[in-house]
Swiss-Prot record:
InterPro entries, A to Z: Putative_chemo_U83
Organism superkingdom: Viruses
Keyword terms: Cytokine, Disulfide bond, Signal
Disulfide cysteine pairs (residue numbers): C32-C62, C33-C76
Gene: U83
Family label: Belongs to the intercrine beta (chemokine CC) family. Highly divergent.
UniProt organism field: Human herpesvirus 6B (strain Z29)
Organism classification: Viruses, Duplodnaviria, Heunggongvirae, Peploviricota, Herviviricetes
Protein name per the record: Putative CC-type chemokine U83
Length: 97
């Protein structure tokens, strides 16, 4: 009796490895984004929505960079969304409301 495994072909193994790496990359990016929450503790829902939008945008760009085969060290460039720039953005929103 023959027993078959879905992951037995080299292509399936490669796909599984890419999927595992992609998940790790996204988890790493999510952890980077989660660190930003320490910068703005106790903010109201008014601030939470733009904060979440920034996190989602950075996750998408990080994942897109990974898919473009950039080096792992450069795929999570946080320069444009550092805690300082996030704080300034939230401060501006606070003044406008």
């Amino acid at each position: 009796m023959a027993i078959g495994f879905i992951g037995s072909s080299p292509d399936a193994e490669l796909s599984s490895e890419n999927s595992r790496i992609s998940s790790s990359v996204l988890l790493g990016c999510l952890l980077c984004c989660t660190d930003w929450s320490a910068v703005v503790p106790g903010k109201t829902e008014t601030f939470r929505k733009p904060f979440v939008a920034i996190m989602i945008k950075k996750l998408k760009s990080c994942f897109a960079a990974y898919l473009s085969d950039l080096e792992q060290g450069s795929m999570c460039d946080m320069a444009n969304a550092s805690p300082t720039s996030l704080e300034l953005g939230l401060s501006k929103l606070d003044k406008e409301s």
